[in-house]
Amino acid sequence: MLSTPRTLKCLFVCLAVGIAGVSSARHVRVQEEGESLDGVVDLHVHAGPDSRPRSVSDLEAARGAAEAGMRAILLKNHFTMTADRASLAMDQVEGLEIFGGVVLNRAVGGINPEAVRQMVEFSGNRGRVVWLPTFDAEWYVKNVGEDGAEFVSIMQEGIPVPGVLEVFSVVAEHNLLLATGHSSPEEVIALIPEAKRLGVQRILVTHVFSQGATREQMKQMASENAIMEIDWLAVLNGSRSITDYTMAIQEIGAEFFVMSTDLGQAGNPLHPEGWHAYIGAMREAGISPGDINMMSRRNPARLLGLDPW
């Protein structure tokens, strides 16, 4: 399905703002029957403090995940590093692995290899992920953002900018996970071989449907052993359907996907609630327990360097 800039703008506004009024609780123990969250790993957790309204703090998100039996969460913030926050949360919450990373938006200097190096050096060793630009990505700004807004280029005339290659080298040196942010499918397909050439071992295509990747483009990404994220928020706000996801899973293979929530927006369900609904919807759509386990536990654990579940 082709997406117009207007459609894409609506999609990402929904992703950023969320659906108001779904839940006002700040921290609850989810006690729904049927869908165990034991061992689940969420690679897309938003929480506060943030410059955007969030439903929970880092600590509240971590406590909720631990109480639900989840194995690990990855804290994501579009404008500041989260490795330090993950370390602080780890000191307060038992029974849960908590990781962070850095998004290479303008707030940290854009394509800034030094931001990645400093993240790695922070005490606690919780920095595991580098995201290419998200809200400041060229594709995002031109298709979704405000007219004339600044963006961070990762390619020029079809060639990666030098800073991107240096970032890839730092990612490879420290065996980090590279996530593609809001890069276009064409940029992702061009950059994956460059990252692998420089030694990057693990690549995550950030919510692959949201940037409008076609099925053939997804197959190209899979052929390079990239893992593609499919998030619950896009289904929750109606921009994607479970059928979109299940068709791709059945055609390409569950081994190339990870499920995540991308929740944390004020007014949206809490992360464990999202997981219960997401897993239930996948089961109802005919996805096998084994494939759900692969996409919600095994694949994301491997991407974070954890032992297989």
Where are these regions (language model features)?
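Bacterial N-terminal signal peptides
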Residues: 10-20
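Acidic (Asp/Glu)-rich catalytic clusters
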Residues: 34, 86-95, 118-125, 169, ...
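An N-terminally biased module of ancient metal coordination in phosphate/nucleic-acid-related enzymes
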Residues: 26-96
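Mid-to-C-terminal alpha-helical segments outside catalytic/metal-binding sites
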Residues: 275-276, 280-309
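Extended substrate/RNA-proximal surfaces in nucleic-acid metabolism proteins
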Residues: 96, 109-204
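Catalytic pocket-lining loop regions of alpha/beta-barrel enzymes
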Residues: 169, 176-240, 258
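Histidine/acidic-residue-rich catalytic or RNA/ligand-binding cores of hydrolases
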Residues: 51-55, 83-85, 143, 188-194, ...
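Short acidic/histidine-rich active-site segments
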Residues: 231, 254-271
